[in-house]
């Protein structure tokens, strides 16, 4: 069982256009809306592939019915009722793949809401992983994910995918796994990371601060996994990119589904490929065609330039 925690869920609207004209009228070719949020996306990807999961999330009363209708029983949820409305995130996707995102802040959580979410997450039985994902809404303390990690009972590993101060706090709280992207990793260590060796050294630095393993999403350069005893890099060259929204969530879901260690890196990248070949936030099932281009390097090339 993998429990996800999404403190700031969203309704994700994806609008496809030919080309964005700032200040002009833009006509959509296609528009979709999905119940989302990073942890919800992870749970949906896991459930699609037969992995037991429960998504813990605050459910704002004013838009709860819309969110549940869009979710359509895709995953079991443990909802914490709160006041307000669920935020809407808009992704504008141009024909050449350019993505422009507009994200609302989300409803304000009270301290009681925060406590209720943490209690709900720790109350799901038989969980091997508890996965905290996404931005923090107004009212949530910066140590929200650190508190989530501190509450983990023996036998439950905690993975965190967030950014900024909240991610730094989770590192110091001893999370079993953190999943930054390259920009987030640079922010955590306070310097630019231009090569794969730079990224690996930064990951080692975070492990020295307290977390046990680091999974770095590198965009077109694939993904890097580092723990105290292993280091590996996986990549794939593909041309048919439909949408990069949700690719990092799929990467994390695939990694955890494959066991949450170095041996799962190839699967993680394959799941990410399936996501970027899928329109909208929700990924389709992984196929042999998604696995075929994945190359796993057990020994990394430290001189390799990133952002290729």
Feature-to-residue mapping (PLM):
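General beta-strand structural signal in soluble alpha/beta enzymes
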Residues: 4-7, 57, 78-79, 131-132, ...
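Conserved phosphate/ATP/ADP-binding segment of small-molecule kinases
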Residues: 143-158, 162-229
């Amino acid at each position: 069982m993998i429990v996800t925690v999404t403190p700031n869920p969203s309704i994700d609207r994806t609008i496809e256009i030919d080309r964005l004209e700032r200040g002009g009228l833009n006509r959509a070719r296609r528009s979709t809306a999905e119940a989302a949020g990073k942890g919800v996306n992870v749970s949906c990807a896991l459930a699609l592939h037969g992995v037991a999961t429960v998504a813990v999330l605050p459910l704002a009363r004013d838009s709860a019915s819309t969110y549940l209708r869009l979710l359509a029983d895709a995953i079991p949820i443990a909802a914490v009722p709160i006041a307000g409305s669920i935020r809407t995130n808009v992704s504008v996707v141009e024909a050449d793949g350019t993505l422009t995102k507009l994200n609302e802040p989300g409803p304000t959580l009270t301290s009681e809401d925060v406590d209720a979410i943490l209690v709900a997450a720790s109350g799901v039985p038989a969980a091997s992983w508890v996965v905290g994902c996404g931005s923090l809404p107004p009212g949530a303390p910066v140590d929200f994910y650190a508190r989530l990690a501190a509450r983990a009972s023996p036998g439950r590993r905690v993975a965190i995918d967030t950014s900024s101060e909240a991610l730094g706090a989770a590192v110091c709280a001893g999370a079993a796994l953190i999943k930054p992207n390259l920009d987030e990793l640079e922010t955590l260590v306070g310097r630019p990371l231009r090569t794969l060796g730079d990224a690996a050294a930064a990951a080692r630095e975070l492990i020295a601060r307290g977390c046990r393993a680091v999974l770095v999403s590198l965009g077109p350069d694939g993904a890097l996994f580092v723990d105290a005893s292993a280091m590996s890099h996986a990549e794939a060259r593909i041309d048919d990119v439909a949408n990069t929204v949700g690719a990092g969530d799929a990467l994390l879901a695939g990694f955890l589904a494959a066991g949450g260690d170095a041996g799962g890196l190839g699967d993680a990248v394959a799941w990410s490929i399936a996501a970027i070949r899928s329109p909208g936030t929700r990924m389709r099932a992984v196929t042999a065609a998604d696995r075929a281009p994945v190359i796993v390097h057990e020994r990394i090339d430290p001189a390799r330039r990133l952002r290729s």
